[in-house]
């Protein structure tokens, strides 16, 4: 229940923060809750059969997302790599389902936006899964406790890759290439309104929560170990991480559709190859 409420509250905090950074008064922290309730109460305009598939797709995305959060919690408590790999697999399903949903909407603008998301997702999800898997293995072996600078560099590079990939997965500027940022949750569903938009917005917010916990859990595990205390530290760091991502989004400018995926691919390949090379050299020296 806590995980179901947190993303809605933190999104309200993010909107308030953005308004403050842009010298605006902004909406109340509870505005996102009001928006979702308002959309749920709005009567659907479209009666196309497609809307049923959209409902099923978004609902399955939310359910698998909540299941992913369950395994992340187990990982933070026990430190079992299998739990994190389950969480990554479920998150990949969540992201894939959410990403391909616009492709079944009978509207060219929605389809184009969906294709852009697919292209970006192909690049980013591979880096996210690879970096967090490496990060999890390092956390399991407590490699950060080593005083060897080579190990510290490798851990830092993997952590940097994981945090970059998690930021991109949150669909914030400049990686909101499907639509302009205010329309990330609604533009690709231009033909629908009401509860469909509410489900899509909530699915997006849930993904933003998951990607932050995916990188925070192994980070805290490296520093504090895996226990109930570690889980509490993760939850305490969550609002700060969310605010940091929101601040970065305000500072950064937009990117071209053809530039963002290619640039990300170059960055990810470079960082991951260097970190793996460093670890291999350390293992055989």
Located regions from the model:
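Alpha-helical transmembrane segments of multi-pass membrane proteins predominantly involved
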Residues: 1-285
């Amino acid at each position: 229940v806590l995980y179901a409420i947190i993303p809605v509250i933190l999104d309200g905090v993010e909107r308030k923060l953005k308004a403050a950074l842009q010298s605006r008064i902004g909406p109340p922290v509870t505005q996102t809750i009001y928006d979702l309730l308002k959309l749920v109460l709005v009567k659907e305009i479209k009666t196309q059969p497609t809307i049923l598939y959209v409902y099923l797709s978004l609902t399955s995305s939310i359910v698998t997302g909540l299941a992913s959060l369950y395994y992340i919690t187990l990982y933070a408590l026990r430190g079992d790599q299998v739990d994190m790999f389950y969480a990554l697999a479920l998150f990949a399903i969540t992201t894939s389902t959410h990403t391909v949903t616009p492709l079944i909407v009978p509207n060219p603008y929605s389809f184009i936006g969906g294709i852009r998301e697919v292209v970006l997702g192909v690049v980013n999800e591979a880096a996210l899964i690879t970096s967090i898997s490496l990060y999890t293995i390092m956390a399991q072996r407590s490699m950060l406790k080593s005083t060897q600078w080579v190990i510290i560099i490798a851990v830092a590079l993997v952590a940097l890759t994981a945090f970059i990939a998690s930021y991109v997965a949150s669909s914030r500027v400049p990686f909101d290439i499907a639509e302009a940022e205010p329309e990330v949750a609604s533009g690709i569903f231009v033909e629908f309104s009401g509860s469909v938009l509410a489900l899509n917005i909530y699915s997006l917010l849930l993904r933003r929560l998951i990607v932050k916990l995916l990188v925070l859990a192994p980070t805290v595990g490296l520093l504090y170990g895996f226990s109930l205390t570690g889980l509490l530290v993760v939850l305490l760091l969550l609002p700060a991480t969310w605010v940091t991502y929101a601040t970065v989004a305000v500072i950064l400018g937009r990117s071209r559709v053809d530039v963002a995926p290619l640039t990300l691919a170059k960055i990810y390949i470079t960082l991951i190859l260097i970190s793996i090379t460093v670890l291999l050299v350390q293992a055989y020296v």
